[in-house]
Amino acid sequence: MGKITFYEDRGFQGRCYECSSDCPNLQTYFSRCNSIRVDSGCWMLYERPNYQGYQYFLRRGDYPDYQQWMGFSDSIRSCRSIPYTSSHRIRLYERDDYRGLVSELTEDCSCIHDRFRLNEIYSMHVLEGSWVLYEMPNYRGRQYLLRPGDYRRYHDWGAMDAKVGSLRRVMDLY
């Protein structure tokens, strides 16, 4: 199991809260989050309670201010620990409900367009492991956690559109 510590102020100062499991509502523990230390595991942070809003993927390391995790503000309201798996496999579909051209990945892909000539993915089936989807190539832009399961439409993974730029396997070792 992973371990993450949230700090209200930059540079690991101020009130802190240590967490080692999923938490749908962090508001009772701190009012703002300006720095984070991930001691172990991989985590997805959410700007709103109940795993809603912008998502931020963090792995082991120190994040002395919210810009270090590409945050837009000091609002972190929920978090998920992402379990480690040794194998990863995901199927991508060019249309919703698993229709159209299908492509499969087992490794990180820094540019979906270069690899598959697709700019949009409308549905996915995560067969093994957890993945982070990025809206732009080279692991940039909005992030979405994809855990094993079915994603019939882009709304199912929390996106506002079908734009997919890159995909990365969630692994504790980078």
UniProtKB/Swiss-Prot annotation:
Q: Which residues form a coiled coil?
A: none
Q: Name one GO biological process term.
A: eye development
Q: Which SUPFAM superfamilies match?
A: gamma-Crystallin-like
Q: Which PROSITE patterns match?
A: CRYSTALLIN_BETA_GAMMA
Lineage, top ranks: Eukaryota, Metazoa, Chordata, Craniata, Vertebrata
Put simply, this protein is called Gamma-crystallin A
Question: What are the UniProt keywords, alphabetically?
Answer: Eye lens protein, Repeat
**Additional notes on this entry:** There are six different gamma crystallins identified in rat lens.
UniProt remark on domains: Has a two-domain beta-structure, folded into four very similar Greek key motifs.
Q: Which gene encodes it?
A: Cryga
